[in-house]
Each structure stands twice: as structure tokens, then as C-alpha cells.
A protein has these predicted regions:
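Extracellular/periplasmic catalytic domains that process cell-envelope and extracellular macromolecules
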Residues: 95-96, 148-153, 204-207, 228, ...
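Conserved active-site histidine-acidic residue motif and adjacent donor-binding/catalytic loop
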Residues: 190-204
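Secretory-pathway glycan-assembly enzymes, especially type II membrane glycosyltransferases
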Residues: 1-193
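Eukaryotic intrinsically disordered and solvent-exposed regulatory patches
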Residues: 143-144, 198-200, 221-222, 243
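Catalytic binding pocket for nucleotide-activated donors in carbohydrate/polymer assembly enzymes
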Residues: 206-323
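Helix N-terminus capping/helix-initiation residues
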Residues: 24-28, 202, 219
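C-terminal end-of-chain micro-motif
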Residues: 1, 323-324
Length: 324
């Protein structure tokens, strides 16, 4: 790993993010490319059908919807974390600051009554009113540099993260904390279970393990994306929530190793894959291929723009048509 990667613990650099975001915000008051121009660009691409498949996945609402809306310019930094503010404004830039919309920041685990732009939504059930955007991307989309072969990694699973007040993580710790096949630790400052408290571990250090636990917290597990981009394997129950990463499309045994929802089979699953490591390595390779879908920044911006355009078409069908 390079020195800069180690110094920032493998996470995205927030200073660079905010410098870039303020610069983009200033451009909004000058030049920005219109969404119709981006739509024309998309239609000229050979992968337009694949792009629209993702657009339709993120925005499932079937037809025009009425209800209260607000202009983009009226969503201020005081209403949510700055990263949500900047990511929203980046997505809305091709439409202008007076565009009317509905937006719900933060970790969203329920479905709004009306079509609304959100970061996350439940996977099961009717989730059409939750229209997904790539929000809080600096936390959830981390690129990792992992050159360590799977065979050279430690024969154990690892977890580092906040545990208290997160029921799924507490369930795992109550069952398996201290098990020899799992290096698990709670890095939160919350009171309770001092025996679970352990030292912080960088992403680079966690990548020294063959298996990394991706246990949902408030909504999705924020480490799942960088695990799947690495040569290690994600272990988790079937996900309950999804984001721009389309966790609902992940398949157990192909993209991640599935655990029971109560984690009762953790030891059994670990012992199986430690004696069938070629299968685990194949899952890691499949996961990396899945992640390649999200690596093309221009393509991702086109998909984001068309997702917003389709959503706005629900509110104002006359002005926003992407299928005509």
C-alpha cells in the first residue's frame, strides 16, 4: 500500500471532496450542461439499453404523481450533513436550482408516501416511491488498492465498526465476539460492553483477512462496496436495504458469502470456506466484476442525470421525457 493510502486509513479524502464540491457549486451560478444534452449523449452510446436498465431500477414509480415540492436551491446545508447537500446539488446541476423536487436525506429505512429522492430504501416490498441517488458517496464508495493474493491473507474473518444501538451487529457480537475465527471489535464511544472495545483498524489492515463481515447498521453496511472491490470476501446475511450500489441485485454464493440472519451458522460457514478456498476466491472475483459497473465516472453521471430526469417526469410529465 502507498504511504498516502495508509495515512488516510484507506478512506476517501474529505478535504479534497469539499474543495471540489465548493468549486462545482460555484459553477452552478455560471455554466452547467443541460440534462437534454446529456440525454442525447446517452442515446448515442452503445450501452444505452444497459444505462436505462439501471435508471429504471433506481426510479420505479410508474406514473405522474402530485404533492408538495421544493426548489433545489431551498435545500440548504443546515438541513443535512454537507456531503448530502453537495451530492444532491451535483446530481441536480443539469436541471438548475429552481427545479421542484422532494428529497429525504440521511439513512432512510422506510418508503415515503410520495416519490422522493433518497440514498437508501428497503429491498423487499413496494419501494417504488424511494428513488435512489448516489448520496454520501464519499463514505459509501471507496476505492481500495488490494494486491495481496487471497491465499496470503489470514484464515479468519474481521469486523471493525460501531456496534452499540445497532441490533444486527449486537446480535453477532453476543454470539461470536472472542471466537478464534473472528477478529471483531467495536470502535464506537458509546457506553456498554467495554469488553467489545478494540483498537481502530485501517482498511488496509482489514484487507489482510480472507473474510470481512459486512453487517448492516442504520441501513446498509458502508464497508460492503470496498470489500467487494478487494480480494477478500464479504460475509453477511441477505441485505435488507439498498443504495446506488443495487444491493438487491447481489446473489449469495456469487457476490458474497451468506450467513443466517441470526448469525447462528457463522462457525459452520467459516469452516466450510476455509476448506473450500477456491470457491471463496471465485466469489471475490465475481464481486470485483460486479463493482466494475460503477467505475466509469462519466457513465455514472449520465445514469444519475437520467434517473433524476425520469423522477422529475413523475412530477412534470410535459417537461421531462426521456423515452420519447
Amino acid at each position: 500500500m502507498d504511504l498516502f493510502y495508509r495515512l488516510r486509513s484507506g478512506k476517501n479524502n474529505k478535504l479534497l471532496y469539499f474543495v471540489n464540491s465548493y468549486a462545482h457549486e460555484a459553477l452552478w451560478h455560471g455554466f452547467y450542461r443541460s440534462w437534454r444534452s446529456i440525454l442525447r449523449e446517452a442515446r448515442r452510446r452503445n450501452d444505452f439499453a444497459a444505462i436505462m436498465s439501471r435508471v429504471n431500477y433506481y426510479c420505479k414509480a410508474p406514473g405522474p404523481q402530485q404533492g408538495n415540492t421544493r426548489a433545489v436551491r431551498n435545500f440548504g446545508r443546515h438541513e443535512a450533513a454537507s456531503v448530502y447537500y453537495f451530492d444532491l446539488h451535483k446530481a441536480m446541476r443539469p436541471f438548475g436550482p429552481d427545479t421542484q423536487m422532494r428529497y429525504l436525506p440521511g439513512d432512510v429505512t422506510t418508503v415515503p408516501l410520495l416519490p422522493t429522492l433518497t440514498k437508501s430504501r428497503p429491498i423487499k416490498g413496494d419501494n417504488a416511491n424511494s428513488v435512489l441517488l448516489k448520496l454520501n458517496a464519499i463514505r459509501h464508495f471507496i476505492s481500495v488498492s488490494d494486491t495481496t493474493p487471497f491465499s496470503a491473507k489470514k484464515d479468519a474473518a474481521v469486523f471493525r465498526g460501531k456496534v452499540m444501538d445497532k441490533p444486527k451487529r449486537m446480535d453477532f457480537f453476543n454470539r461470536w465476539f472472542g471466537h478464534p475465527l473472528c477478529d471483531a471489535g467495536d470502535t464506537s464511544r458509546a457506553a456498554g460492553h467495554p469488553e467489545w472495545k478494540t483498537d481502530f483498524m485501517t482498511i488496509a489492515q482489514q484487507l489482510g483477512y480472507k473474510f470481512i463481515l459486512a453487517i448492516e447498521g442504520n441501513d446498509v453496511s458502508s464497508n460492503l462496496k470496498w470489500i467487494m472491490n478487494s480480494r477478500s470476501v464479504a460475509m453477511m446475511p441477505e441485505p435488507e436495504y439498498e443504495t446506488w450500489f443495487m444491493e438487491g441485485r447481489l446473489r449469495a454464493g456469487e457476490h458474497y458469502i451468506r450467513l443466517n440472519s441470526d448469525f447462528s451458522d457463522f462457525e459452520e460457514v467459516m469452516e466450510y470456506y476455509l476448506t473450500h478456498q477456491a470457491e471463496a476466491e471465485a466469489i471475490a472475483a465475481n464481486a470485483r466484476r460486479y463493482c466494475e459497473e460503477f467505475h466509469d465516472r462519466r457513465r455514472e453521471y449520465i445514469i444519475s442525470t437520467l434517473t433524476v430526469a425520469k423522477y422529475l417526469g413523475l412530477l412534470d410529465p410535459a417537461d421531462y421525457q426521456i423515452n420519447s
